Amino acid sequence: MESRLGWLTRLNYDTGSALRRTSIIGTIGPKTNNPETLVELRKAGLNIVRMNFSHGSYEYHQSVIDNARKSEELYPGRPLAIALDTKGPEIRTGTTVDNVDYPIPPNHEMIFTTDDQYAKSCDDKVMFVDYKNITKVIEKGRVIYVDDGVLSFEVLEVVDDKTLKVKSLNAGKICSHKGVNLPGTDVDLPALSEKDKSDLRFGVKNGVHMVFASFIRTAGDILTIREILGEDGKDIKIIAKIENQQGVNNFDEILKVTDGVMVARGDLGIEIPAPQVFAVQKMLIAKCNLAGKPVICATQMLESMTYNPRPTRAEVSDVGNAVLDGADCVMLSGETAKGIYPINAVKTMAETALIAEQAIPYVPTYDDLRNLTPKPTPTSETIAAAAVAATFEQKAKAIVVLSTSGDTTRLVSKYKPNVPIVMVTRNPRAARYCHLHRGVFPFVYEQEAADEWTDDVEARLNFGVEKSKELGILSEGDTIVTIQGFASGVGHSNTLRVLTV
């Protein structure tokens, strides 16, 4: 049996003609929000466009959607997915007098209050916080972080139902409208703000393909979002962003109801001790892999490339290790939203992911997934797992899946084949969703269905093979494994074949 250590001792990091299978998500900002730049980003490796709804107007986000679709007209290439990242429930400070930034020395004592009369008149003596229940949930001795942890305060006393007495633990400046984190404290904020609800309705109206749901704490939060998306948004995939201790604690229940997960390490690294983040990342990714749910690794992956043309060695290792952990997607934030080198950042991420994929011990990984998956599995999963096993034995170059909904494609991706998964579908939305799953290369078949089912199967299969040749996945004489159904529609994938191109 192949071992992980044995695989690594023989590691060949020459990628040759291999194609990257990890998807790349890029946040679009003013510097990249035009069709021409989006085309270049896609050529560099971008698969999913992210809109950050913490910033920008509806007019701006509409322009991102329009430009993303225009880029596909200019450069058809592979289908491009569009994701809406919600602002989510959050806690913020009030407005300082004249918007002045007040210096705070260490051991400075002051008041945090939820009294609305201070909302627009904060200073270095009294700071308004917009979370009304903060005095009910926090305890003496707890730490409060302001501005992503730039300032830390210890709670000295819960004075009354509106007032906390706090002491600064370090020097800094207290400013208007900064984020507030309460590490180790369970908060009872609503799953969605009114802004979030409006944003989701905007996303449904504009046909976004996925929602990155911020600050998910319970499974109920996902169900609330699904309710807001409604019938018109029933096909939108919900990706739960795990950003706090509550989300980690309730992860198993969240995983059951979400379509996928994002390990959002920014706020997570504030809410839990930073040294624990890498371990939590590995645990969450492993659970997603076993469940067959897509998982995204995000935040500061190539942060230095916001202003520098080359990444740090630690950043390259971070991207590579996220791929080795089992992430389906890796994400760029400021690097592509406001950075000086957005295209280079995507290229760097693509090149790093490609090399990292050569380091994955595919057979041991497959064995782990098969052994740990509860039996019996549904027919479609049994076929998917068998297809991946067949690629190892037959030395196949690709798995071609004729798919309607994309679910069988998801299951094939779960078992981490060492070859591309070529998805042929008539469903353009399913083709875009599948970028959430590692290794999937989608092609939309636009021809009407043939009268004879077998003729239609062969036509779609030939289409997938020809497109794969164009992309460099297949050549004449290559062996492929195919999955198809015995009838049209969803849920009939039960036939596996081994063919020669």
Curated annotation (Swiss-Prot):
Q: What are the record keywords, sorted?
A: ATP-binding, Glycolysis, Kinase, Magnesium, Metal-binding, Nucleotide-binding, Potassium, Pyruvate, Transferase
Looking at its record, which EC class is this enzyme? Answer: transferase
InterPro entries per record: Pyr_Knase, Pyrv/PenolPyrv_kinase-like_dom, Pyrv_kinase-like_dom_sf, Pyrv_Knase-like_insert_dom_sf, Pyrv_Knase_AS, Pyrv_Knase_brl, Pyrv_Knase_C, Pyrv_Knase_C_sf
Residues the entry annotates as binding substrate: 50, 266-267, 299
Q: Which GO terms describe its biological process?
A: glycolytic process
Cofactor(s) this protein requires: Mg(2+); K(+)
Q: Which CDD domains match?
A: Pyruvate_Kinase
Bilayer-crossing regions:
none
Q: Which pathway features in its UniProt record? A: Carbohydrate degradation; glycolysis; pyruvate from D-glyceraldehyde 3-phosphate: step 5/5
Q: Per the record's keyword annotation, is Transmembrane included, yes or no?
A: no
Q: Which reaction does it catalyse?
A: pyruvate + ATP = phosphoenolpyruvate + ADP + H(+)
MF annotations from Gene Ontology: ATP binding; kinase activity; magnesium ion binding; potassium ion binding; pyruvate kinase activity
Any single GO CC term annotated in Swiss-Prot or TrEMBL for this entry: cytoplasm
> Where, by residue number, does ATP bind?
52-55, 92, 178
Pfam assignment, any one: PK_C
Residues annotated for K(+) binding in this entry: 52, 54, 85-86
Please give the subunit comment from the record: Homotetramer.
Family (UniProt): Belongs to the pyruvate kinase family.
Could you tell me which NCBIfam families the record lists for this protein? PRK05826.1, PRK06354.1, pyruv_kin
Q: What is this protein called?
A: Pyruvate kinase
Q: Which organism is it from?
A: Eremothecium gossypii (strain ATCC 10895 / CBS 109.51 / FGSC 9923 / NRRL Y-1056)
